[in-house]
Amino acid sequence: MTALRIISLHIYQYGKFSNRTFDFSASPVQVIYGLNEAGKTTMMSFIESMLFGFPKTKKYEPKTGGVYGGVLEAEHPEYGVLKIERTKGTAEKLSVYTEKGEVKQGDVLKQLFQGTDRSLYKAIYSFDVFGLQEIHAFNRDKIGEFLLFSSLFGAEAVSKLDSRLTKESERLYKPNGRNPQLNQELETLKQLAVKLKQAEAEEAGYHQLLEEKRTLEARLAAAETELKETAGHIRMIEGAIERKPLLNEKATLEQVIAEFPEHAGQFPADGLHQLEKYESHLHPKSAQLEALRVKMAELDKQRQKLIPDKELLAKETLIQELSAAFHMYQSWGEQLAAIQAQLRQTSAQTAAGLEQLNKTDENELLNMNTSYDYEWQLQQAVQQYVQARDRKRQLDETFELARQELEDAEKAVRAASSAILENSQRKDKEAALRAYDETQGQHQEQAKLREQLTFFERQQAKQKKTVIAAGMLFIVLFSLLQQWIPAISFGAALIVYWLVSGKSSSRNSRETRQPMTDISPAEAEMLREALWEDDRNKQHLLTQRAALQQKEAAYERVIQQFEQWEAEMAPSFTQVERFMNELGFKEDPSFLLDAYSLMKDVKKEVKKKHELTIEAGRLKKHRRTFEERVSMLLPVNQSQDISISDALHTLRKNIEREKEIEKQKKEIETDIHYTKEQMLELEQEIQYFHAQIEQLFAAAAAKDRDAFFAIAAISRQLKDTENKLHHVNAQLQGGYPEELELADSNTLSELKDKQFVENERKERLTEEIEQLRSQIALLSVKQEQLEASGMVSDLKLQTEMQKERVKETAKKWASIQMVKQVIRNKLERHKKIELPRLLETAGEFFRPLTDGNYQTIYFSETDDSIMVMHRDGTVYHAEELSQGTCEQLYTAIRFALAVTRQGESKLPFQLDDSFVHFDQERLKRVLHVLYDLSEGGRQILYFTCHEHVKDAFHSSQIIHLVS
């Protein structure tokens, strides 16, 4: 056999698919999974279209344009890999590409598929769950027609062919119709016959001829009738001769039956079978009754041992209530632990706050005013106090600065006053200078030198100030940075520099004073410089005195600002002191707001502490009440040494134990009751079977079992004789009553004599009939001559022509009836030969599908409906099967049809959710059958939307379609 396997599909445009490629696995069973509207039916139609051409009715042409069609790639053992490309524009185009690069036309597909078209493929290889769900409604004729025509011509061929033949037959003839062709031709023939009779009546002498002819025809009919009667007598005599031995045997058997005793016929028809059946039921039931009595005694012992604690069971509701409320008890414990932790934390925070506030009594804080108005007044008072304190600090700094500046100004005035020359010294210098000017007026170069020396000294003094200032700056910087060694080094360097520069100044001063004694030019210049410096010092003194007056005025203004501050800020200090007294705060007033905030927090913690203490007491009370309720349910010796959870667990365990005891007791009581009912039922059945056996003995007129068997033997002999007599009577009933009466009233020799007489009479009648037929033939010739002379001949011709037309139309109608009869004969042959073979193959599939529960499929002999036989011998009609089993039956028949009708070609199966109603076991078995069916390379494509069906296959076998 050759098997075609689809490798892949490439869809150009087909239905909802556009430019899609689907690759099939090498597994013979391939699953195409997708939800509703995912394209499963579209893919099935695409495969059929690629193999057999596009459908003419239900088309899948693209709505948005594009190439309608695609490519199907398949593998064939003989042709190798084939690519079937089919597209449709104005006309359908088909190309078949081989793996050798050859391009073939559609004839290769017809050869490959061996004449299988789309309808035959859908009838054999493609089916779904709705195909034959009502299979139980089909009888032998219906399913035979369906399977035959679906296998030969397609599923719809039977109805179309039958309808077409019926229409053509009714177009030609209907028994009571007017319009059909044969009905009209017969009506025309009838009218011509009437006209012919009228014309014949007008012919003279014609009627006499006809009368003579009718007389001969009547004699001929009478002779033929007598001949038939004679033949009947002969047949009756022959039948009597055949039945004469049977009558003799019947008489002998009746005599033998009459010799049997009268009670032999009273024995029940199936007495031995009934006795065996009753005894076969009686013995096991007696054994069952004895076993039940032993079981009854054992159950009664077990019941007496089981004594449940009724008092504890009465408390089951309370224990269940406490068990249900145990989570509340645990919750109370957890809440209590959390509250105690919070209480410890709150107490610690309260103690820390009191310690920080330097207080010991926490109740003082409860009376503290924490209103918003009080807090606002406190904030205002503290804010004013802080502002006053900051203002005083600023005034202190200003006062200190003004005082320092005043002292500096006084020192500067004193320094400037000390730098001015006394009047005597100034006068001496002025006199010396005037004398020098008078005597030394020509020493200009010396004067220039003195000016340069003076300039150098000024530059040296500026440099000295710069170095000292920089040194002091570095000393202060290193002191701030706490780097004492660099600071000390810079200090020592400054001291050395100052000493060296001082000696240089002293040396210069001495050099300057030396010319004064000599009244040198340099000395004279120094005198002028000294007088000029004295004038400048006087001017500087005036400036310092003016600055001193300004500093004194600023000092007075600071003192006035102190007095104004004392007048304005006194109420703020008073208000702050009041708040400090009210709050018991003795520290710096600037920290009063922080202390107040801390007091509020501590007050909240104190309140929280009191609330937590109250809540802890409430929870302890709830837990104590719950513990007391649980303790009341426990025995006295256990109530003190067990936790609540263990106590509840023990109570629940005890309840469960007692309930289990009570349950076991009830079950045993139920078993006892059921056992009593069984014993009563068995006793009644045993009594019934004993009564039936007694009735059976009474019916046979037997005293005991031995007598019953003796009578049974006599009855069996009588039955055999009666059966022989019945067989003889059945053979005699096959003949006519006249034959039996004739055989009974005559001997065998008398019957043979009568047979000889009737045979001679038959020969005489045969000769007479031949003579009459010759005479009638001569009269018919004369009649034809008369009819040929006038109108009668024309009408006769028309009548004969019309008869020919009627014959032609009747032949057409008869040929249609013959075709219908041929089809019926073909169906009958298919039902008798092919259909049993098909059902045998279907049974081979049906057995593994049902796990061997059903063995055989056949048709009922009464109504030709489908019957199946269970493995226990029970026979079921199709309508008595479950839906799943009925679908298994349908699946087996479809598989058998494919196997028996596929010829030499194996095309892929397409199953559309055919097993949706199967459970897991049925699905597993049908998958095994599918794999067995796929042996030899047959490909099976299973389309489904169900998850559990998909999960039964390997992932490599599944193609997913997206909705």
From Swiss-Prot:
UniProt key word Lipid metabolism: no
Matches recorded under InterPro entries: P-loop_NTPase (IPR027417), YhaN_AAA (IPR038734)
Taxonomy, superkingdom: Bacteria
Induction profile: Very low induction by mitomycin C and UV irradiation; probably a member of the yhaONM operon.
Compartment annotation: Cell membrane
Residues that span the membrane, as ranges: 468-488
Keyword set includes Zinc: no
Keywords: Cell membrane, Coiled coil, Membrane, Transmembrane, Transmembrane helix
Coiled coil residues, start to end: 176-236, 373-467, 536-570, 647-789
Gene Ontology annotations for the cellular component aspect, listed alphabetically: plasma membrane
Pfam families according to UniProt: AAA_27 (PF13514)
Protein name stated in the entry: Uncharacterized protein YhaN
Organism name: Bacillus subtilis (strain 168)
